[in-house]
Amino acid sequence: MFLCRVPLSCKEPVKMYWNKSDTNHCTVVAVGFKEVGVDIEYMRYRRFEDISRRYFHKDEITDNMHTFYELWCKKEAYTKWKKGKIAKYMSQKIDKDMTQLVPQSRYQMTELDGLPYNIRGYLCY
């Protein structure tokens, strides 16, 4: 894979960050000048209540497909942004607006638009 066919010339090296996620024949690559984390998931029926009971905070247990994938994608994008372990952040409750996992962390969470109707995704930066 080439990002550029012509080598870039600059006096100082440019620090770039990237992250990728793929699901069901769909791939997203996020590139930026600071840390990024991205996650997309193909939404299909699962036993959401059982899965959320096992992995999410007790207040986040849900049987709703859209809520489940929203929480899952946000937590996974955040984990990738932090370069952390998924088990550590999946069980942490996110705030009312579902944007902040760890209050002292400074980041932004954005829902990805333009994805197929059955794929949900979030970008953390």
Feature map (PLM): residue ranges:
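Conserved nucleotide-ligand handling architecture
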Residues: M1-Y125
